[in-house]
Amino acid sequence: MREYSVFFQKSLKSVEERAIITIKKQSAYCTASRNERRRMDYNMGKFVVKETKTGIKFDLCAGNGEVIATSEVYSAEKSCLNGIESVRKNCVGAVEDQTVEGYETVKHPKFEVYTDKSGEYRFRLKATNGEVIAVSEGYKSKASCLNGIERVKKNAPAAKVVKDEKNA
């Protein structure tokens, strides 16, 4: 896998905050023992950019490699990388639970929790403009789905971006 250096200056504050987080993680990583580094690598999320038959997409993976959220298929790599930045920017959104009757509508950006046709719980992350930028797998319980949202919020802001060379 190859690491990308992706910094879009959507807002200077968020870029500065991300840089500070990255520097803190790097300095902690440099002073850690080999076993501590392995644990740190295991706990860090990452965006994995993959080529498909029809374009390019990304998966947000937890430190253990489990896919937390997936994007749509983009026609260009630059659009895919913009989608990653959009997830980072919008993952602070509130949760709108559409499984509850008479639920309260929440302003974008937001996570929408819903049930699919097979009765599984899923979430989708919508950007400020209302576009869906990431979706989840199906979960058997609402608690697991809400946990998935928390993992997106935890992993996305500082996740590194790597290219999946196996599918290239």
Listing of model-derived features with the role each one plays in the protein:
Residues 61, 81, 155-161, 165:
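Mobile acidic interaction elements
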Residues 41-53, 89-117, 159-168:
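Intrinsic disorder/low-complexity detector
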Residues 16, 20-31, 36:
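Short, positively charged and aromatic/hydrophobic N-terminal segments
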Residues 78:
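Glycine/alanine-rich phosphate-binding loops at beta-alpha junctions
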Residues 4-8, 29, 42:
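Aromatic (phenylalanine/tyrosine) cluster motif
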Residues 68-75, 95-102, 133-140, 161-167:
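Short, tandemly repeated low-complexity microdomains enriched for cysteine and small residues
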Residues 46-52, 57-74, 83-87, 110-116, ...:
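A structural feature that tracks compact, well-ordered secondary-structure segments
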